[in-house]
């Protein structure tokens, strides 16, 4: 805090937030199960521009209830990888110059790096929403949301009983075919590959854009 001239305040956000005067921006970065509670407390005490750490909530019902309480406030959920220059460069290319023909993406997780002490168990049991949605949302941000999709999963992990291997394919609302794969028991990484009329593009890692031209 001292390095960036911030004043640190320790304690329960239920007690601290009411004491904070309205700011230009409030960033909510708590364990997942507390995100909306802290955001609502901020709204109740006059904050109007709030950035909430992803995923906001693990449950659609909670997000919909929270949405009903928003009037004039500006509320965003922070999927920061949408701000990568590489993503916007590829998006611009595909909008202006080249038509997307198909897409493949991977969301294999480095589970050996996960800190299992930061959140409640349902955060890890819904890890696709908690974390993998970063790359999934980027892919669909490029090609559009699924119109039809076939999904398959197998295996399990102690903390993620619904599966450890995920595959699927479908067609988006823009009529672009896509496929995906993830294996949380093996090696790999996040990545997106876009095939256009002229080139194939890879966001692997997501921060960098690589191109493979025809011929």
Give residue ranges: language-model regions.
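Hydrophobic residues in well-ordered beta-strands that form the structural core
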Residues: 51-52, 75-77, 203
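Short, well-ordered coil/turn residues at beta-beta hairpins
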Residues: 29-30, 186, 196
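Beta-loop-alpha module in the N-terminal Rossmann-like domain of NAD(P)-dependent dehydrogenases
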Residues: 8-51, 55-69
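A contiguous active-site-proximal alpha/beta segment in oxidoreductase catalytic domains
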Residues: 17-20, 56-116
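N-terminal Rossmann-like dinucleotide-binding module
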Residues: 1-7
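C-terminal glycine/acidic-rich active-site capping loop/insertion
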Residues: 197-215
